[in-house]
Structure formats: structure tokens, C-alpha cells
Amino acid sequence: MKVLNNLLYTGDHEWIRVEDNKAYIGISDCAQRMLSDIVFVELPEVDDEIAKGETFATIESVKAASDSYMPVSGTIVEINEELEDNPAALNEDPYGSWIIAVEMSDKSELEELIKPEVYEKICEELDKEA
């Protein structure tokens, strides 16, 4: 299981990579392993405004459907359209296959996210339970 040090994470297994006021958001390696074979991703629309904690995508696998929640509030400026034709990209490269990019409305919300070293321990515990 891989946890990247240049990202922040949520307890719901989303990751966020910040570039100035723009943030790319996806699901972690830990999440894609729990979901297993991803077959469909329901994406939001560009220009949608979504608050922190609200659902921004639904990811369906052969095992289950899972909502993904916004780690920060913002306006969607880009969606990863590749996922419409190739949802399995989230399994193959969860950190390269971002889901959405947002213009953040409150950067202070980043302070509430989980640091990589803490998130790694969370995932290790989940692996032990599996």
C-alpha cells in the first residue's frame, strides 16, 4: 500500500494535492484496494460549488458503491474525463488518476486534513483488520 508524502488525506480515504489555490482530489491507494475492481465513476459538473464534507463523486466497484466527500470547499474547475471511459484507472494509478480539480474557497480547511505519516498508520491498521 502506498501513501505519498506530498499529499494530505481524509478519514474517508480521499487525497488532495494543492497547487496555489487549486486542489486536485482523488481516492487513495487504501481506498481503491478496499473497493477492488472499479467499474464506474459518477462525476460532478464543472462549475458546481460543493462544500467540505459533501459528496462530489460516486465510485462503483464489483463489490460496492462508495461516495467520495469533499476534503475542502470549492468550485469544480476540472473533471478527469478519462475516468468516464476508464474507471479502472483509479485501481491502476490512484494518485495519478485524480477525480476533480477545485478552486478552493477556504484554504484554512487544509489544516483539518490528515498528514501522510498519520494516514499511513490508519491504513496499516485497516490492513491488519482485513
UniProtKB/Swiss-Prot annotation:
A GO biological process held by the record: glycine decarboxylation via glycine cleavage system
Keywords: Lipoyl
Top-level taxon: Bacteria
Coiled-coil segments: none
Alphabetical list of InterPro entries matching this protein: 2-oxoA_DH_lipoyl-BS, Biotin_lipoyl, GCV_H, GCV_H/Fam206, GCV_H_sub, Single_hybrid_motif
One Pfam assignment: GCV_H
Essential cofactor(s): (R)-lipoate
Signal peptide annotation: none
GO CC term, one of those recorded: glycine cleavage complex
Domain Lipoyl-binding residues, every copy: 22-103
Modified residues (N6-lipoyllysine): K63
Cofactor binding description: Binds 1 lipoyl cofactor covalently.
HAMAP family: GcvH (MF_00272)
Role: The glycine cleavage system catalyzes the degradation of glycine. The H protein shuttles the methylamine group of glycine from the P protein to the T protein.
Subunit structure comment from the entry: The glycine cleavage system is composed of four proteins: P, T, L and H.
Family: Belongs to the GcvH family.
Protein name: Glycine cleavage system H protein
Species per Swiss-Prot/TrEMBL record: Clostridium botulinum (strain Loch Maree / Type A3)
